[in-house]
Amino acid sequence: MLNNEYCKRVYEQILARDPDQKEFHQAVYEVLEGLEPMVERRPELEKNGILERFVEPERVVTFRVPWTDDAGQVHVNRGYRVQFNSAIGPYKGGLRFHPTVNLSILKFLGFEQILKNSLTGLPIGGGKGGSDFDPKGKSDAEVMRFCQSFMSELYRHIGQFTDVPAGDIGVGAREVGYLFGQYKRLKNASEAAVLTGKGLTFGGSLTRTEATGYGLCYLTAEMLKTLKNDSFSGKTVVISGSGNVAIFACEKATELGAKVVAMSDSNGYIHDPDGIKLDIIKDIKLVKRGRIKEYAAQVPGSTYTEGFRGIWTIPCDIALPCATQNEITAAEAEEIVKGGAMAVAEGANMPSTPEALSLIHI
């Protein structure tokens, strides 16, 4: 509950202005709750309307994205770019292609990106963008045509000194490559810094793909060492998701001596008591772009279960949610606690609801 009157008033203004943006409300509330002690000490923040500026994007761009499928049928999706804050540098944040994408989700992601980017010590601001386009089940040619259409509008609003997008859910090196190619075509210039997450053959960075998953495990290892005088060694780990964050969290946790026994995608989850065979997961998800249920068909002794939320019923020592926002509700948190987990570390953006956090924070 917010106690500071200034924080409370700013939050109430957000609720009144955008009553349907639940994910954004949640992100702002959590941040304001953490900022209350500082706000109490700094009355000049209220005088200068700093929090009001902090929670309102500088600019929101919405546009249509027409594209043609392989059968010649025209489709129209909606594209977004939320340019949230450029106080210390160009907007910086990923692009998400997923059917659930809406303004509330992108505002929450862009808002959190301000804080994440400021912690790097680099002069970069925060933003986020994407579309309700679903790349799953689409051919390479269809994804390329969509990306080219998307960039045909987005290019007007970005630049290496203005706004630097990257990847997120549904946007990997393939999609970034298509987007970058169209940007170069439209601008008649090779501005490599306009997009991050590119392939290594055209300006990408080594370990960029692994960075989030590895970083999550390094942070978790430090938490275990500092707070529990313990480590990953010999621990059982459950990881939700099977994208870049989850895959490379699995890789690093295994290197640190843990046994990862479960992973998931949006349809369901796999359980392998002997430990996930990561080479098979990589082949299914990164090479074939398939579904995780294919793992159970290839690995004797493993099982696949429909419905991704059930993954948290599997007992573990360490839980690493790496899928999507609000994947852990109070019900899942209760299962994690019941299963005896000693640590929960978040790899996804805001994967736990406030009710879940109240159960996990003990």
PLM regions with names:
Residues 1-206, 219:
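N-terminal ligand-binding/catalytic initiation module
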Residues 185, 221-229, 310, 325, ...:
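Conserved helix-loop functional segments at active or binding sites
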Residues 207-210, 214-310:
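Glycine-rich phosphate/diphosphate-binding loop of Rossmann-like nucleotide-binding domains
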Residues 245-249, 327-331, 352-353:
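Short glycine/serine/threonine-rich phosphate/pyrophosphate-binding segments
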Residues 308-315, 327-341:
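Rossmann-fold NAD(P) dinucleotide-binding segment
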Residues 320-322, 347:
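Short, well-ordered coil/turn residues at beta-beta hairpins
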Residues 332-351, 356-358:
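Generic long, charged, amphipathic alpha-helical segments
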Residues 360-362:
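Conserved small/polar residues in nucleotide/adenosyl-binding loops
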